[in-house]
UniProtKB/Swiss-Prot annotation:
Biased composition (Low complexity): 150-163, 185-194, 280-292
Name the record gives this protein: Protein SOSEKI 3
Biased composition (Polar residues): 221-244, 418-437
Tissue-specificity statement: Expressed during embryogenesis and in roots.
Biased composition (Basic and acidic residues): 471-482
GO biological process, one term: regulation of root morphogenesis
Keyword Kinase: no
Species assigned in the record: Arabidopsis thaliana
Gene name of this polypeptide: SOK3
Motif Association to cell membranes location, chain numbering: 342-343
Amino acid sequence: MEARMKKYSREVSPERAKVWTEKSPKYHQKIKKVQIVYYLSKNRQLEHPHFMEVLISSPNGLYLRDVIERLNVLRGRGMASMYSWSSKRSYRNGFVWHDLSEDDLILPANGNEYVLKGSELFDESNSDHFSPIVNLATQNMKQIVVEPPSSRSMDDSSSSSSMNNGKGTNKHSHEDDELSPPALRSVSSSGVSPDSRDAKNSSSWCLAEYKVYKSEGLADASTQTDETVSGRSKTPIETFSRGVSTDEDVSSEPETSENNLVSEASCAGKERESAEISRNSVSPPFSNSASSLGGKTDTLESLIRADVSKMNSFRILEQEDVRMPAIPRLRASNMLMQLISCGSISVKDNNFGLVPTYKPKFGHSKFPSPFFSSSFMMGDLDRLSETPSLMGLRMEEKEYFSGSLVETKLQKKDAADSNASLKRSSSYNGDRASNQMGVAENGDSKPDSSKNNPSSRKASSILGKQQPLVSEKRRDSSEDTTKNIPCTTKTHDACSKRITESLRKPDSFREDEERVIKIDERLASGARVRIESKVPSEEP
């Protein structure tokens, strides 16, 4: 029968003839182990990928709890709970991140490839600021640490107003125990007699000592005076001290109000000394501030003077057009060089400055005439117009001075007569010698000009005197000249008009002949100066 059954089974279904055998455990282990690539996102940035192998606990597939258990083994317990996990899966034509929980099944991204991503979790209470849980854990650890004395001094300042009488000490200590953290509360509330404290921890008794000063009597350092300092020294500053012992052998007996008063009085001497030191250190030294202000004013004045001196300390070379800073006080040698160069030296507040006179292109000259210097002509026109003896002075006589007038001012009272020298240049002597014959021939035909020559010779002596002396003798000279030379008011106006017109039109004196005078001079510095001026002839 058995042989027939075997033959029948082989003919009917060959698969039924196979014996069912269970697979070996090694085969099951190979199937349960899966390779996973995961990313960690910190500060919103993905790190480099990590690789690990996870055993599948369920025949349905890989669950997230299997991955979390493997991470706790590899990276430490609690590491996986700090992240939210998501898996990469195909969606339509691309890939998406599928958020997962612990009981969710992880789908492979491609075949047997699993890709996971862990993102940092954010706290719900601080979701607006996006603070991660890792930072919250460190903040909780910092809260356990003892608060600094600066933060506690703010709490004590609010309750220091209740220290006016003896009852306020118990009330203040009770408030501090409520405001202080548990670590400090256990230390401060534990009662120990002051004698035992001094015996055990005399060195560590005043380690955490701090003081709270009342704001009364204190003033700003900038508004302190001698009166306020003396008044504040009479009224003592009320202080409150708190001592925190660092010994670990402190017993847990309750501290009474009397013990508080004794413990506060133990450090009163030190507090008073420190209060006096702090009181004295508030007021700044007034002498230093005054001296510093004086130094600032000195520097400002020196800067202003330096700017003013720079404005008037430039020498102008007419040939090369180069500006060079000159010495503010000229010596005798420098003054001679100025006279040689036919320049005008104007004296203002004992500071010398060179004013160009023979080039009208400079705008700072008061009177841009090629024949007269501004410092001489503008001051002497009034005197010439008032004195009839000087009204007949020829313009060609004044052209030889060419701005070489030196006006000096002396501040000393002894030197009352500060004479100004009016020198004629070398060109005048040469022209006078050449024209001496022509003047002698025309002397008979023109008696008016011969009369005016002595007055022109006296011009240098009259103008060389000091200005107040000329103003005082102005009437006397006018009376003497009117006796010698009669002149009416009409002629006076006509003469003044002739002088003003001659200043505006210097070419209208001589229309017949003109001559060119050239002066070549070399200064000590090596610069060569050439002066060319057109001079009309002496004939009218």
